[in-house]
């Protein structure tokens, strides 16, 4: 049973006086939206230089960086969070160790957070291709893997959830071939021939890690968490192989939510994308700023200006202050620095960028949204800091959302890759969040109780404040 809210409890005495004439809770009309759901994404930089190192670091509870990551998450207390750059290994032992040794342990007064459910899966980073993908004459470098990486699983990701993951309905697109996307931006050489041979393209996956659709059951309403981490649009040449791959990786989700995905085939052979009435939230580090950085033109706009997507436009005061203090490339940026989510080199470039996103479907009510980026005079600045960073060069991005409620309840489907653990106190796991958070650093955008964030202001605000 869900706990009573403060508002409900305050009404009980009056309700009891008129019990004979008042409708019972069972007779009351259900809300048209879900309760407030706090959803977050965080590139936590929990990647390591060799396989097994992350597992070793998490075996004990004294790793400083992992403690900072956990405290950052505890300060926001999201119901669902995607963590990018969390090295993957097949038995998910690191996922469990981070939960038990860090998330469920208090840090500097922050309350422990319990996630009974989690998902992690294999990725293309570090998987040897056997081909010279970067044209340097070698076939064994990290750039010759299907996704840049020194070993299979490096730069993977994990999703933690307070709600059940419908594991038998998870869809992944790790092995979908880039060439099979209609109109794919395949790179070419200066003479117009393909950068990659037909032999390479017949094995080349579009996703540099994986793209995964995780249906999560939120009290009978299914929310599709669409998680990915496209390749950075940098470290290439005139052929723009990484820029173009980044563009098409972003396009995959744009097509998936817009009824343009008939060509898409998942790793189990099922075709197509989401139905028009599906609830979803796109999460991840997409390595693409709408106006600055190295992106192929229009890359992230495929999502930000999509009629199917709401830009929650999270902000922070810390991002604005750091752009001013760090100067350099930031002084010529066009994106409002309040939207920045990554703190990168400023001399000469690229400067701080907006590259991490929480993007729900149209019809979702946005209560608040923010970037966890404290200012330097805030005690919590120790969690973000300056280079070399104590935690990550990315900032956690969060949004408090009310999704349209489904008419047909759905049932959870636990499996071996979806684990349930008791809370630290031994009580039943808390699977809901009131959404009442205080003390979150930064400026949060609120649109009022029950207000719908209008799509028409997405790009207007970005450009008018640039």
Where are the regions a protein language model picked out?
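Bacterial N-terminal signal peptides
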Residues: 9-20, 450
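N-terminal, active-site-proximal structural segment of metallo-dependent hydrolase catalytic domains
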Residues: 27-157, 187-204, 219-223, 236-238, ...
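A substrate-binding/cap region within the structured catalytic cores of diverse enzymes
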Residues: 143-185
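Active-site His/acidic residue clusters
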Residues: 226-245
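A cross-kingdom C-terminal cell-surface attachment/processing module
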Residues: 438-461
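Cytoplasmic C-terminal tails of single-pass
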Residues: 462-466
